A protein has these predicted regions:
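Short secondary-structure boundary segments
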Residues: 72-106, 148-149, 156-168, 172, ...
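Terminal amphipathic alpha-helical/low-complexity segments used for targeting or macromolecular assembly
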Residues: 1-61, 169-170, 203, 209, ...
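A generic local structural motif
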Residues: 56, 62, 74, 92, ...
Length: 234
């Protein structure tokens, strides 16, 4: 699969930055995980500039679009921004440090922590998203989660996914907490686990019940079985 290299992992290759309020900060990163430590500060800085005719400010460091729907049983912790026309459903748990874009769905029993959801992202059923960036119109099926800490607590290193040899050396991130980066339009099947440091390229499909570790290229299909397999869509 061509063009599967370090360049394909860069922020500009994974995301259309016009679909997030974090664009000015992401534009200054080479790789998107570089923003993870700054998410709380980014949210506070953006929040202070949001127009009061479009956003409510119900508590310190929390901004919720007037057009958004937040169920009474959902919890939104600071700092957080909930974008326009976004739906936060019953039982959702936004722990804090969550920048949720426009037109998103955060569903029942979904937990968000230190993450950016681009516009149109859906995490609608029993998802955990921690220390992650989810691109425009990406979607996680029911029960799909990001695992953000390695069992031995060692720093995360980004590598090619099992089953495919990418044209790049392992990239140390220096982070002990790092979930996943989902490119625009990425689809993650039900009950899949995205292990620490997973990168899913734009327009890539991850089959249900997959255990993904490493970087999966754009426009691919990832399957788990006796071993992992990556195949082209055509």
């Amino acid at each position: 699969m061509k063009d599967y290299n370090r360049i394909s992992l860069r922020t500009q290759a994974l995301f259309d930055l016009t679909h997030t309020l974090a664009r000015p900060w992401l534009e200054h990163t080479e790789y998107p995980w570089e923003i993870l430590s700054d998410i709380p500060a980014v949210i506070r800085e953006i929040g202070a500039t949001l127009p009061t005719d479009l956003y409510d400010h119900p508590a310190e460091d929390i901004w919720i679009a007037k057009s958004a729907t937040v169920a009474p049983t959902a919890f939104v912790g600071a700092p957080a921004i909930i974008g326009e026309n976004t739906e936060v459903r019953h039982g959702a748990f936004i722990r804090g440090s969550a920048l949720v874009g426009d037109g998103c769905v955060v569903g029942n029993s979904t937990e968000l922590k230190n993450c950016i959801l681009f516009d149109g992202t859906q995490v609608p059923h029993y998802n955990y998203v921690g220390d992650s960036v989810l691109g425009y119109k990406s979607h996680m099926g029911a029960g799909a989660i990001t695992s953000n800490v390695k069992s031995d607590k060692s720093p995360v290193v980004v590598k090619p996914a099992s089953g495919f040899e990418g044209d790049f050396d392992p990239i140390p991130t220096g982070r002990k907490k790092f979930g996943a980066m989902l490119g625009d339009f990425a689809e993650v099947g039900c009950n899949s686990v995205l292990n620490p440091g997973t990168i899913v390229g734009p327009h890539t499909n991850v089959y249900p019940l997959s255990s993904v570790r490493g970087a999966v290229p754009a426009g691919a299909i990832f399957k788990s079985g006796k071993g992992s397999e990556i195949v082209g869509k055509e």
